[in-house]
Regions:
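Glycine-rich ThDP/TPP pyrophosphate-binding loop and its adjacent helix/strand module
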Residues: 1-120
Length: 120
C-alpha cells in the first residue's frame, strides 16, 4: 500500500508462485485464489512469467523496467513447480521444509545434470 500511495514506479517485486505451502497445496490450505488479480486490486502492475524459462524471466524484467512512468510499482509473479526437473520432488509440497536423503540427493543432482559436490 505504501508503494502504491507513493507511486513507486521504480519498485519491482517478485513472487515465486508455485501453488504450494509447507503443509499442502495452496488452494487446500489457504484458498488464496487469483494472486494476480489481488496484486492488481492493490494497485500494482502485474506481470506473470514462467519461472523455469530464462527468456520469459528476462522478458518479465524488461516489461517491468518499461513500466517506469506508470506511477505504479510492479509485481512479477513467477509461475513455478516445486521440485521441477526431479521426478520424485516435482509437484509435491513434501520437500518444502525438508531435505532429501543422501541417495535421493545423488539421484536429484543426476536428474538436473549436476555432479555431486561431496558430503553434505
Amino acid at each position: 500500500m505504501f508503494a502504491v500511495f507513493h507511486k513507486l514506479d521504480n519498485l519491482i517485486a517478485m513472487t515465486d508462485w508455485n501453488g504450494k505451502q509447507i503443509d499442502g497445496p495452496l488452494e487446500e490450505v489457504s484458498g488464496i485464489g487469483d494472486l494476480s488479480a489481488k496484486w492488481e486490486a492493490w494497485g500494482w502492475n502485474v506481470i506473470v512469467a514462467d519461472g523455469h524459462d530464462f527468456d520469459s524471466i528476462l522478458k518479465a524484467f524488461e516489461l517491468a523496467k518499461a513500466g517506469k512512468g506508470s506511477d505504479k510499482p510492479t509485481m512479477i509473479l513467477f509461475k513455478t513447480e516445486m521440485g521441477h526437473g526431479v521426478d520424485f520432488m516435482a509437484g509435491t509440497h513434501k520437500y518444502h521444509g525438508s531435505v532429501p536423503k543422501p541417495e535421493q540427493l545423488e539421484d536429484a543432482l543426476k536428474q538436473l545434470g549436476e555432479t555431486p559436490l561431496g558430503d553434505f
